[in-house]
Amino acid sequence: MAKRGFNCLLLSISEIDLPVKRLESPNKTRRPYGASIY
């Protein structure tokens, strides 16, 4: 049950974080923020 909230949190974080990371390092692989965790 807590996993759903955790996924929502990750999603909101990645939505903010991904564009920033793309601007900082476009050379790196464009992976979702939570992909490294699972």
From Swiss-Prot:
InterPro entries per UniProt: Humanin
- Which superkingdom? Eukaryota
Q: In which tissues is it expressed?
A: In the testis, expressed in Leydig cells at 10, 20 and 60 days of age (at protein level). Also expressed in pachytene spermatocytes at day 20 and in vessels, peritubular cells and spermatids at day 60. Not detected in Sertoli cells (at protein level). In the adult ovary, expressed in stromal cells, granulosa cells, theca cells and oocytes at diestrus and proestrus (at protein level). Expressed in the anterior pituitary where it is detected in lactotropes and somatotropes with lower levels in females than males (at protein level).
This protein's name = Humanin-like protein
What Pfam families is this protein classified in? Humanin
Task: State the organism of origin.
Answer: Rattus norvegicus (Rat)
Q: Does the keyword Ribonucleoprotein apply?
A: no
Relate the induction remark in this record: Repressed by estrogen in anterior pituitary cells. Induced by estrogen and progesterone in astrocytes. Induced by growth hormone and Igf1 in Leydig cells at 10 and 40 days old but not at 60 days.
**Cellular localization per UniProt:** Mitochondrion; Secreted; Cytoplasm
Per UniProt, the keywords (alphabetical) are: Apoptosis, Cytoplasm, Mitochondrion, Secreted
Transmembrane spans: none
Say what the protein does. Answer: Plays a role as a neuroprotective factor. Protects against neuronal cell death induced by amyloid-beta peptides. Also protects against excitotoxic cell death. Prevents amyloid-beta peptide-induced spatial learning and memory impairments, protects against amyloid-beta peptide-induced suppression of hippocampal long-term potentiation, and inhibits amyloid-beta peptide-induced activation of STAT3 and inhibition of CASP3. Prevents glutamate-induced dendritic atrophy in hippocampal neurons and also prevents glutamate-induced decrease in SYP puncta number and total puncta area.
Name the CDD domains for this protein: humanin
A single GO CC term for this protein reads: extracellular region
Major location category of this protein: mitochondrion
